Amino acid sequence: RWTHENYSVLKYYDLDKDRIKTVAPRQRYLAPSIDKNGQIAAVSRSTIAGKNQLVLVNLENGKELRSFDVPENAFIKELTFGADDKITAIAVTDTGITLFQFDPSSGMWKELLQTTSVNITSPIWKDGKIYFESGANGTNNIYCFNPADNQVYRLTNARFGAFDPSFSRSDHRLFFADYQANGYRIASLPADSLLF
């Protein structure tokens, strides 16, 4: 069976030098997210022994800094760093999909959302809130989880689906892919007009 062993390789594209650099060859890293300083990658890893982990990798030399077992041995499918260096993980458990927050300084995990059977994807942090896409109401829309009140708010009301949220640099507009009968189009809304 080891004849078919394979790896996932952590790489990045250097725009200034116009080349691809391999950071960590022959690993089992998935779903990389880069910290605000561009020095550390948080990645998901499934070990040969079947443990699911969050791993912090030094992007300068590819060395593993630390690894942490995921609660309930959940599989992390997406990661994102917040402004406070805490990491949000969308994870698949035996009972569904959940949203975890991880604090690298303490090594503590916190479950932010109860496990659900609907898909959650494309997480981003903005102003202390987590924005993501989900089909919770039957159609994919953009949602926001506010840790201050532990509530989830639907922000868009797309007819066929809203995907891949992102904020403009000025922070005044939410951009997303709006699915239409003739394909995807880029849409945006002023932040103060969202369905909060």
For each predicted feature, which ranges?
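Residue-level detector of Asp-centered blade-edge/turn motifs that repeat once per structural unit
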Residues: K36-N37, G82-D84, W125-D127, R169-S170
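A flexible loop/linker signature enriched in serine peptidases of the S9 family
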Residues: R1-L10, A24-Y29, V43-V55, D69-F75, ...
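Short loop/turn segments that connect beta-strands within beta-propeller blades
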Residues: D14-D18, N58-G62, D103-G107, N146-N150, ...
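A short beta-strand motif characteristic of beta-propeller blades
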Residues: D18-A24, K63-D69, M108-Q114, Q151-T156
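Strand-loop-strand
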Residues: Y153, N157-F160, S168, R173
